[in-house]
């Protein structure tokens, strides 16, 4: 990730239009902004997972993810599981380790990729 093509700015996340994304179970609501070079933008999201959300895919994209509320369980394709609670984050590179998200309680996340 290279962050050199945009100026200082602020984001009022409540003013960003939400989009819904169905999981295998539950729903994800994203508020998404893009910054930087149009050819390789940085995507920044505020994501909310409903209780019982399970992603409908194994993700191979890299992220920096911070848990703001709730609890997020991430399973890697080798079977390892990690639980994030508020104030915890994870980092993974593109194509490094496929991962799938689940939350029993619901979760609010800040994600950069």
Map each language-model feature to its residues.
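A short, N-terminal "cap"/entry segment at the start of jelly-roll beta-barrel domains
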Residues: 1-43
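Conserved short histidine dyad/triad with adjacent acidic residue
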Residues: 40-59, 93-96
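Short acidic-glycine-tyrosine-enriched beta hairpin
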Residues: 78-95
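Short beta-strand His + acidic residue motifs that chelate non-heme Fe in jelly-roll/DSBH
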Residues: 56-57, 74-75, 92-93, 97-104
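A short hydrophobic beta-strand segment most commonly corresponding to one strand
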Residues: 89-92, 104-113
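Conserved hydrophobic/aromatic positions in well-ordered beta-strands
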Residues: 45-47, 65, 110
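Short, conserved beta-strand element in jelly-roll/cupin
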Residues: 49, 58-74
């Amino acid at each position: 990730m290279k962050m050199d093509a945009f100026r200082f700015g602020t984001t009022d996340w409540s003013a960003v239009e939400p989009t819904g994304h169905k999981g295998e179970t539950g729903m994800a609501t994203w508020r998404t902004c893009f910054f930087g070079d149009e050819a390789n933008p940085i995507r920044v999201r505020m994501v909310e997972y409903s209780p019982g959300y399970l992603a409908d895919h194994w993700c191979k994209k890299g992220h920096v993810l911070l848990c703001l509320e709730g609890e997020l369980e991430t399973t890697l394709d080798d079977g390892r599981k990690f639980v994030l609670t508020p104030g915890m984050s994870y980092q993974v590179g593109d194509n490094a380790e496929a991962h799938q998200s689940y939350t029993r309680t619901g979760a609010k996340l800040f994600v950069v990729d």
